[in-house]
UniProtKB/Swiss-Prot annotation:
Taxonomic lineage of the native organism: Bacteria, Pseudomonadati, Pseudomonadota, Gammaproteobacteria, Enterobacterales
GO molecular function, one term: dCMP kinase activity
Annotated binding of ATP, by residue: G14, P15, S16, G17, V18, G19, K20, S21, S22
Organism annotation: Buchnera aphidicola subsp. Baizongia pistaciae (strain Bp)
Keywords in alphabetical order: ATP-binding, Cytoplasm, Kinase, Nucleotide-binding, Transferase
Catalytic reaction list: CMP + ATP = CDP + ADP; dCMP + ATP = dCDP + ADP
Cross-referenced HAMAP family: Cytidyl_kinase_type1
Pfam families: Cytidylate_kin
Protein name, UniProt field: Cytidylate kinase
Signal peptide: none
Matches recorded under CDD domains: CMPK
Annotated GO CC locations: cytoplasm
Subcellular location, record wording: Cytoplasm
Length: 230
């Protein structure tokens, strides 16, 4: 076993709007662990592609990768304390960037390219990894794997509320409904790393639960492991 693999990982997977990011932040604060928001990595890459008006082709994307140091850029984002410029955060939070990120996630060599970037966040004392394939592909040896689900309309409403609170000017219910539906279909049906629970994942339905309730449920499972004492 390598030194890196001695670092414990807890994964939280699920579709958008189920509360992964918020729960991830609560759990990481309780455990004082590092955080990986894998969706942000795809969104940052999607924003760079959008900003540079790069067409979707292997040649164009490869040229872009050679001209940017994505690894260094990603490492400068402190997920644990959510340190990221407000302008960049607002840009990558837009739903159209999320959809572009979802399209990128369907490209095999993009996923392979970003696999190392994601695994590089595995550092002591531990890592809370949030995404769509954290427990199935990126960290299959995670000590605990959670998969959050929620009613679709509840997820859309949560996303609208999130945008309103953050002052993001793309809070159109019908558009968000359509975009999330499209993204769900793409995430579930892609051939590479589809959005599915790991075989040993713990499924949590957050439809009628508050952030505090969901966080407490996850923490109760975590605390059952003797090594964790808060």
């Amino acid at each position: 076993m390598s030194f890196k693999n001695l670092v414990p990982v807890i994964t939280i997977d699920g579709p958008s709007g189920v509360g992964k990011s918020s729960v991830c932040k609560v759990i990481s604060k309780k455990l004082q662990w590092n955080v990986l928001e894998s969706g942000w990595i795809y969104r940052v890459l999607a924003f760079i592609i959008f900003k540079n008006n790069v067409c979707f082709s292997s040649r164009n994307l490869n040229i872009l990768f050679k001209n940017i140091n994505l690894h260094d850029f990603i490492q400068r984002i402190n997920f644990k304390n959510y340190v990221i410029s407000q302008s960049l955060f607002t840009n990558i939070s837009q739903e159209y960037i999320g959809n572009l990120a979802s399209r990128l996630a369907c490209i095999p060599y993009i996923r392979h390219f970003l696999l190392f970037q994601q695994r590089s966040f595995r550092k002591f004392p531990g890592l809370i990894a949030n995404g769509r394939d954290m427990g199935t592909v990126v960290f299959p040896d995670a000590i605990i794997k959670f998969f959050l689900i929620s009613d679709f309309k509840t997820r859309v409403a949560r996303r609208c509320l999130e945008y309103e609170k953050k002052g993001i000017n793309s809070c159109n219910y019908k558009k968000i409904f359509y975009d999330m539906k499209t993204r769900d279909q793409r995430d579930h049906n892609r051939k590479i790393s589809p959005l599915i629970p790991a075989k040993n994942a713990i499924l949590i339905d957050s439809t009628y639960m508050s952030l505090k309730q969901v966080s407490n449920v996850l923490l109760s499972y975590i605390l059952k492991m003797q090594k964790f004492k808060l």
